[in-house]
Amino acid sequence: MESTTLASLAAVSVLAAGAQTDMSDVLWLLILGFVIAFILAFSVGANDVANSFGTAVGSGVVTLRQACILATIFETVGAMLLGAKVSETIRSGIIDVHMYNGSEAVLMAGSISAMFGSAVWQLAASFLKLPISGTHCIVGATIGFSMVARGHQGVKWLELLRIVASWFLSPLLSGIMSAVLFYFVRKFILNKDDPVPNGLRALPVFYAVTMGINLFSIMFTGAPMLGFDRIPWWGTLLISLGCAILTALVVWFIVCPRLKKKMQSKCLGPNIADTSGTQLVEKKPSSNGLMDHHPGPPRNYSPVPQTPPADSNKVAFDIGGSAETDLDKKEFDTKDQDCTHALNGSGGIVIPDLSGNQFHTVHKDSGIYKDLLHKLHLAKVGECIGEPVEKPIRRNNSYTSYTMAIYGIHGSLKDGEGGSRTGLDGEKRRSRYDSYNSYCTAVADGEAALEDAALAVGMEDEALREDVLEEDIDELEIDKPEVSTLFQFLQILTACFGSFAHGGNDVSNAIGPLVALWLIYDSASVAPSAPTPIWLLLYGGVGICTGLWIWGRRVIQTMGKDLTPITPSSGFSIELASAITVVVASNIGLPVSTTHCKVGSVVSVGWLRSRKAVDWHLFRNIFIAWFVTVPISGLISAAIMALFYYVILPLT
């Protein structure tokens, strides 16, 4: 009996040694696969991860650095907890791996080809600032190498059709969910004269739904390392509901009173907050005497003559070696009054005649440009502006907004409203002052600016308000400061959950082929039954976060600013609806596109806010990129696989 056991152990040892010897010949493929997999994970981070926090950065609730830190945490955790299930679909759900029995090296070479083709196209798309689907890339690349190695028989076409259908359904469903959610937010909160009461009542519901949905998803996935695989579905449902109710109670009794107190303290005076990227100014604490209220009787803000004597309000700025004239209280009040009426379209403003017609370039960090103009305008807008703050002049950049505000130039005066002013003057009026010397150009064109402001005074108030914003975001709503306060942290929370969902869904795009490589090498089988190693998912998460930190800002700009303006309220609707769609898809093992869900939500909410708010030209380019992703990544993968199959592998 003992000799039989020893003989059996010896036979097993010989077979294992033979298998290990055979697989050692393809060790170089495994090493090459790890290198290319990290590059692929880098490209996924540079392109796909930007979708998670792009709207949060675009609305201004977090900075780019803060977004990268949060994404690093939640992408990695989501990859380890949710990524294993979707990796199974990517690894063995697209092609029939049993066709590669006895030719493991061919399947390993195919996995490398798929990762290479996907990485190249995603890096190219990131360079072009186009958000594309990482799932599209890896699926197309997998089909490409399989067509070279085994022809069309190696592809599961029905599975491919199911995935293709999900590509169209995911943006549609996510867009509908986001639009419906934002519709109710706008109807019951944003459109109210006082949005705070309804907003505070809705906060517990929003937090509870966000927490409950994501907790159910995490637990229903059944992560073995957390013991969730031993909890039945009804237990998962009860735990999720309990946590959601607890979250709602905490928000109602702790968070809401603090927010209400915070907003009441800020309501002592009007606030102008730059939370949407389209506001005119940015609220900053006052550190200069120019911002303080002046003692004395109330000021009279009645209209002033359109063309007061130039000598009465002349100011000399200290630029370089220029002379300086102190502003006493009377002169300061006069200038404040003129500036305010120029902003409201009810009065003119005098352009000082600089001696010698010598103009100085005022750079971005100049004290006169940064302190005097900014603080003077901020103080007057906060104290005595008569227009509602929902429709300020859009800030194309800092130079344009300050210059237009000081000189009373309205944002979108049409050519025909200037009467007989054509030619060179019309060109000056339409210029956007986008360079560093825009301030000097505005001074030189002061006379034309005065005429434009005078023309605007005669227009009706309603028509003037409709003409303030640029044509592309006409009638676009802007969140009030109190609404922004309500939705800021909520959008951060939904963005974090969206990043978590993305880590679970899209880490498979980078690690699925690498998992196949490792398991083939480790077990010498093309269809191993071993689960996905956690350390491989962590490896992919590190590569994804590296790509986000180094190159993620390009696609963040497209998603958060270029496609459509984002506010905290609309960003919350986008984040929550798209996160729910992606998390549910991850739990059923369907590799939907996170990019499609997010872009669908952004476009639908932007269109609901205003039909002209969406950059349809950019959306067309993104849509075209979606359709060419599968064939381009497939062709690149097929070319690399042909090189392996016909040249490299026969030589080894």
UniProtKB/Swiss-Prot annotation:
Residue ranges with Pro residues bias: 297-308
Membrane spanning stretches: 26-46, 67-87, 105-125, 163-183, 202-222, 235-255, 483-503, 532-552, 572-592, 622-642
Gene Ontology BP terms: cloaca development; phosphate ion transmembrane transport
Keywords annotated in UniProt: Membrane, Phosphate transport, Symport, Transmembrane, Transmembrane helix, Transport
Residue ranges of the region described as Disordered: 278-308
Membrane-topology descriptor: Multi-pass membrane protein
Gene Ontology molecular function terms on file: phosphate transmembrane transporter activity; symporter activity
UniProt xrefs under Pfam families: PHO4
Biased composition (Basic and acidic residues): 281-295
Membrane-side (Extracellular) residue stretches: 47-66, 126-162, 223-234, 504-531, 593-621
Keyword Lipid metabolism: no
Residues in the signal sequence: none
Major localization class: membrane
Residues exposed to the Cytoplasmic side: 1-25, 88-104, 184-201, 256-482, 553-571, 643-652
UniProt-annotated location(s): Membrane
InterPro entries associated with the record: Phos_transporter (IPR001204)
Cellular component GO terms held in the UniProt record: membrane
Family: Belongs to the inorganic phosphate transporter (PiT) (TC 2.A.20) family.
Summary of the function given for this chain in its UniProt record: Sodium-phosphate symporter which plays a fundamental housekeeping role in phosphate transport.
Protein name according to UniProt: Sodium-dependent phosphate transporter 1-A
